[in-house]
From Swiss-Prot:
InterPro entries associated with the record: ATPase_NBD, Gcp-like_dom, KAE1/TsaD, Peptidase_M22_CS, TsaD
Provenance organism: Nautilia profundicola (strain ATCC BAA-1463 / DSM 18972 / AmH)
Keywords from the named record: Acyltransferase, Cytoplasm, Iron, Metal-binding, Transferase, tRNA processing
Function comment: Required for the formation of a threonylcarbamoyl group on adenosine at position 37 (t(6)A37) in tRNAs that read codons beginning with adenine. Is involved in the transfer of the threonylcarbamoyl moiety of threonylcarbamoyl-AMP (TC-AMP) to the N6 group of A37, together with TsaE and TsaB. TsaD likely plays a direct catalytic role in this reaction.
Keyword Thylakoid: no
Residues binding Fe cation, per UniProt: 107, 111, 291
CC terms in the record's Gene Ontology section: cytoplasm
Signal peptide: none
Protein name: tRNA N6-adenosine threonylcarbamoyltransferase
Intracellular or extracellular location(s): Cytoplasm
Presence of keyword Signal: no
Amino acid sequence: MILSIESSCDDTSLAVMEIDSKKLLFHKKISQEIEHSVYGGVVPELASRLHAKALPKILEETKEYFPNLKAVAVTNAPGLSVTLQEGVMMAKALSIALNIPLIGVNHLVGHIYSLFIEKEEIKPMMVLLVSGGHTKILNFNGIESVCEIATTMDDSFGESFDKVAKMLGLGYPGGPVIENLAKKGSDIVPLPLPLRNSPEIAFSYSGIKNAVRLAIESGKYKPEDIAASFQNKAIEHLTFMCKRAIKKHKPENFAIVGGASANLKLREEFEKLSQKFGFKLLYPEMKFTSDNAAMIARAAVEMYKKGMFLNYKDIKIIPRVDFDKCH
């Protein structure tokens, strides 16, 4: 069994998974959304204090598994350094106390493994990762083989939703509130499609965001129409760039992972792409789209099999990570 810890942002989560069967034996998550919503975004110091409070409470519920643990896994990159620290400190303590190896998991790779909870890996696969501050197209061919096809030049998909929600005076996180408001509106606000005439495969959301700001300031449009127009254009930009990547790399399998993969409009548009290009489309179960320790445990199972262990003295917190570019 592996015990995993996730504390990279504003979700505190622990999981226990069987190594051979990949069966999820325990999974619990405490979200901090309510506490941060009053500030319109995540406050790192507050998040850190809330993790420090929640982690021991959840750990208490996992004690029955301690005698059978073969390793402890923890998200150590990327994320907020003060929140990553909370999870890493607990993982180190468990590694020493139980005399078991430590596995440091890249949170973004963890999101890919959210597809495979209680399932076998599917590879090779092209992956659209839309999680928090990240919007990337990746090529996945196993735990040791993830490379980057494209990334964002400025804001991520998720950040742009949060910022537009803030401009409209809506709550945090922006994804669900924009998605719900958009259902009541019409796509009538003219917004630019970024990088339309650029040959590269990349993302950019600053232009759409600025156009939304000008539309709000003009006073001509209802909030629901702005939300609908923004969401449609933001998703169109994703599909436009993914289409370029799909034409170039011709994947048999294509997955969408990360918090924004819960967006139903986004799923709908990629279903259309799947039918057009003939690839198999995958996304995680809804409960595993946002940050969770189950996906960290699932990635750690593959790392355990390959002996990818760290000494408790050597584990480092890495707030930012870059993948190698695909050749």
